[in-house]
Amino acid sequence: MDPLAFRLTNYAEVEPITGKPFSSKGLRECYARGAERFGWSKRPLQPRSTRDDAGLLVGWGVGTATFPALMFQAEARAVIRSDGSGAMEIGAHDMGQGAWTALPQIAADALGLDMAQLEFKSGTSDLPDGGIAGGSAHTATAGMAIHEAGAAVIARLAELATSDQRSPLFGSGNAGVVARGGRLWRRDDDTRSESFADILARAGLSQIDARGKGAADPAAQAAYAMHAHGAVFAEVKVDPDLCQVRVTRLVGAFACGRVINPRMVQSQIYGGMIWGLSFALQEEAVVDHRSGRTINANLGEYHIPVNADVPSLEALMIDEHDPHVNALGIKGVGEIGVTGSAGAVANAIWHATGVRPRRFPVRIEALLDGGPT
């Protein structure tokens, strides 16, 4: 049976363990988009049935990716100043994943400012706790704290304007205005607006501030299963005599909720796919069972890919709206790329050789022992 057809036949419409509905699940579209881009329809069913011009065995495999949409706790402080500019303060840190690009985008949107009007302060413990960067939860957690802080300070600003008879927004109510371009606008009348600077000047204030917290919604978590999903398709080539394996192509399609910065997300996904390839073929922690110590704790013996090991990569992002996971609709992308890639590589090795890998990393000796050339 075709592996993709097998997965679709056994597709889970609800979370199998709890029976909860998914808050959103774009996995079917991930399968469809990834398979189309990869050319999966041309895959022969029988293993060991394809060779390239050099006589290498060629195999195609697919793996399903999933990772829980987690949130921790964070806090942020938002400021609107009398010159119309704003600031967002949060002690979030960036380890290279692009947080200091994505989080200011969320902040600018929350405050209704252009990026040039925003001062983003981060990276120090003097600021409100930004939560941990881990578990594919940082953007959702810190982002929601920023979103809530922005909403709170805009609500304060709106109260100043809508309760003042001198304001063109008088009587609109907080829910009747929206922040955009450094101004508050009436939702029902685009001709009536007032700048942040004018509102604060009339109130005699140099600035206003507010705080917001980011955390998971217990009611939503109780009602829904929240996951990011994806599908990874792999092509490998195997030397029929030496059983050396080389991954030549990886195509992944992922449904991860709202994408804040497409370029950063794609970079995260690429890193995850490379990590999955490394997990499948190279990485292994060797432990001395007498002492419990790791005995290959160095890059000479713990092998990871170099540039020459990385194949052609392609990551497709599926547009997914999730109204339940959080107010921003964000799911994490830090690890979803890892979870399907190793399985896809192992399945491609089976398709190329007829030998089913049962242990990672897949060693040459396992293929030599498992079947003839």
Give each language-model segment a name.
Residues M88-G91, I330-G332:
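A short, structure-level motif marking secondary-structure boundaries and short turns
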Residues P68-L70, G84, D94, L242, ...:
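Residues that cap or initiate secondary-structure elements
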Residues D94-G98, I336:
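Residue-level marker of alpha-helix boundaries and capping positions
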Residues M1-G55, W60-G63, I106-T373:
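C-terminal catalytic domains of large/alpha subunits in multi-subunit enzymes
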Residues A99-I106:
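Thiamine diphosphate
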Residues G59-I90, Q97:
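Conserved beta-alpha junction segments in alpha/beta enzyme cores
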